[in-house]
Amino acid sequence: MYQCRSRVRATGPSSPRRAPAGWIWSGTLDVVTHTHVAGSIHADATSRAPGWLPLPDDVNALLPRLWSQGVSKDADGVLTVAGVSVTELAEQCGTPVYVVDEDDLRARARTFAEAFAGWEVYYAAKSFLCTAVARWVAEEGLGLDVCTGGELAVAQRAGVNLSRVGLHGNNKSLDELRQGLTAGVGRIIVDSFDEIERLSALAAELEVRARVMVRVTTGVEAHTHEYIATAHEDQKFGFSIAGGQAARALQACADAEWLDLRGIHSHIGSQIFEPDGFEVAARRTLRLHAEHARATGVELPELDLGGGFGIAYTSADSPADPFVLARALRRIVEAECAGLEVAVPHLSIEPGRAISGPSAFALYRVGTVKQVLLDGGASRTYVAVDGGMSDNIRTALYAAEYSATLADRRSDAPPALSRVVGKHCEGGDILVRDEFLPADVRPGDLIAVPASGAYSRSMASNYNHVPRPPVVAVRDGEVATLIRRETVEDLLALDCG
């Protein structure tokens, strides 16, 4: 079993390369229609490449916005990150493996801190968290948004300033609330009347005044998958503004002796590219803020607009620049506050995916390759790798789209419509639904999937009793293990039968 050594020196720096164009493909392009994810492999049986997926001029080329800044390919087509080649990574760490570009993650955290200067920026730990990453984002000036006792324990272990930690969650246990209060977290985001009552009693018992924000739903339907759109009414998070529960929750917190009501929190979803949803949510939230001020004579000092900033998974995705987004949100908030005749509260946001996502890729080794004939004479290449839905469930869960590249050699073969699949006993075990890979992809090749830093390791499982891959960080030609590879022995140690 591979265990990546804690420090490895690379043999040399990477160098950019130019690759020729002129590939030929005889298939046709059409639009993929997704149905229920469990049957997606059958539903797509007669489909072609989706309309957003262009036939590449060069099947070896990388699209820079999908990758961390430290990634390139050398003249032989070998992918390198921060001076370390994927062939070295595979040899030293095994596959599958999540590979984090430390400098890139730090730079993205720093960019949000600079773009939203004067705001509080909390890194959304749910996207990816380990002790090292908690330290990195803190060192780059960010707070931390956690939503379980486990995530809070990582923050505590990392030694971050707990006054800059927010505790989220729609169903926090009494133990988690106690953990947050005794640790001294900077704020607890309350999500139900049950929680307000529970937290108020616990704070009185501990004689600790709990700083709270009220999570509201604004009724905004973000342009994203239903399961990650969190501000429409029919879902588990927050208090409805339209239904009046949000105003009642604010009053309940204001009336509670041991609660210090700081403000309102909203979050409209994830993987959002357009500012329109944020604009509507901010206006509705600020109206509630102003109504509470008129009713109580007290203007709440804080407002959190959440996160959900999208990243590029494919060539069809165009993420917003954080500086452009910051200017737009400032303008919206300032204009709305002026119209409502209230002071601008201290603002905060919670980026997660936008920091961790592009900073990492997943590296796999090909095990089998097969051709499947489609209607009309076209074909699809099924490339099976040594990972799958246990290390990235998003394609199966959300019909998420990803990209991939042949990572350890240059190919002169034409592009072939391919589907990268895993090793699990499940028809929906798909990692990359549609991609053009070289037609000569073969067993033993390395495949890299970009933008795998968010919600891959975080949502990983042990389906089929497969151990979870390690997470390694690369910086200045050195490799460090952040999370070691699980082993079958680890899994058996949990089995008490």
Where do the language-model regions lie?
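Short acidic, glycine/serine/threonine-rich loops at helix termini
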Residues: 133-134, 156-158, 177-182, 199-202, ...
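Hydrophobic residues within beta-strands of alpha/beta enzymes
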Residues: 144-145, 165, 188, 264, ...
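Charged (often Lys/Glu-rich) extended helix/loop segments that serve as interaction or gating elements
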Residues: 328, 334, 342-497
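Active-site loop/helix belt of alpha/beta enzymes
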Residues: 31-61, 218-370, 437, 464-466, ...
